[in-house]
Swiss-Prot record:
GO terms for molecular function: nicotinate-nucleotide diphosphorylase (carboxylating) activity. Pathway: Cofactor biosynthesis; NAD(+) biosynthesis; nicotinate D-ribonucleotide from quinolinate: step 1/1. Belongs to the NadC/ModD family. This is Probable nicotinate-nucleotide pyrophosphorylase [carboxylating]. Keywords: Glycosyltransferase, Pyridine nucleotide biosynthesis, Transferase. Involved in the catabolism of quinolinic acid (QA). Its EC number is 2.4.2.19. GO terms for biological process: NAD biosynthetic process; quinolinate catabolic process. GO terms for cellular component: cytoplasm. Pfam families: QRPTase_C, QRPTase_N. Gene3D superfamilies: Aldolase class I, Quinolinate phosphoribosyl transferase, N-terminal domain.
């Protein structure tokens, strides 16, 4: 969904058939408002906020950019427009900035805890319906990378797919003939044996799902000795406390769904001048 369409839907959701306050406002006038932080965080949502303000004819003085940090009481934006319009967009604007900055802030904490420039931190497809592009954009602003955007990006075979695959090597040979040349094949594995089988069958990426650090290290050592061209990804309930240990296990990437689904809104408010 294009940003403009997304924002039009978001505004429509809040406005319905129109803001009732507009019916009782005797005369509209120009006003100024400030968007301020009430807690620290990493700013995200710039692209969406500026498009929203432009769509609604509101001028903006921006004091912060995506990926920059802010502190409590920092003025993030100064906006000016019709008083009625400022009130109409207030909640939509704040929801966008609070949600996006919440994801970016939690992601930045995971990046810091990872503490390894060689291992990539990835998000997942565990996103809210219709918010995937918005939420994955927020992850990028927190310093991580995106995993698949959708099912058409790469072929990932999970336990639900593999349940009815009898010969993995033959299946991957068949898949290669029917996939685009650039498409990667990733296989989710839950044991050392499954990982070895996936490598020998021809997987490009092997995901170590819900494995301990010790099991992941063992698979990484085997990969290094026999299939050094295969990429390894760790995933499954990896926390701020455990991510550094997984980073040291020998994997190339770590995917964490919590970057998005465990992020909470960063507290912000809008006040009139």
């Amino acid at each position: 969904m294009e940003i403009k369409t997304f924002l039009e839907c978001a505004l429509k959701e809040d406005l319905g058939h129109g803001d009732l306050f507009e019916r009782v406002l005797e005369k509209d006038f120009k006003a100024t408002a400030f968007v301020r932080a009430k807690q620290e965080g990493v700013f995200s949502g710039e692209k969406y906020a500026l498009e929203l303000l432009q769509m609604t004819g509101i001028e903006c003085v921006q004091n912060i950019k995506d990926k920059e940090r802010f502190k409590p009481k920092d003025t993030l934006m100064e906006i000016r427009g019709d008083f009625s319009m400022l009130l109409k967009i207030e909640r939509t604007l704040l929801n966008l900035l609070q949600h996006s900055s919440g994801i970016a802030t939690l992601t930045s904490r995971f990046v810091e805890a990872l503490n390894s420039p060689k291992v990539r931190l990835l998000d997942t497809r565990k996103t809210r319906p219709l918010l995937r592009i918005f939420e994955k954009y927020s992850v990028l602003n927190g310093g991580a990378s995106n995993h698949r955007l959708g099912l058409d990006d790469a072929l990932m075979l999970k336990d639900t797919h593999l349940k009815h695959v009898k010969d993995l090597k033959s299946f991957l040979t068949h898949a290669r003939k029917n996939l685009p040349f650039t498409a990667k094949i990733e296989i989710e594995c839950e044991s050392f044996e499954e990982a070895k089988n996936a490598m020998s069958a021809g997987a490009d990426i092997v995901m170590c799902d819900n494995m301990s650090v010790g099991e992941t290290k063992e698979i990484a050592a085997y990969r290094e000795a026999h299939y050094p061209f295969v990429l390894l990804e760790a995933s499954g309930n990896i926390s701020l406390e455990s991510i550094n240990a997984y980073a040291k296990s020998g994997v190339d990437a770590i995917s964490v769904g919590a970057l998005i689904h465990q992020a909470t809104f960063i507290d912000m408010h809008m006040k009139m001048a």
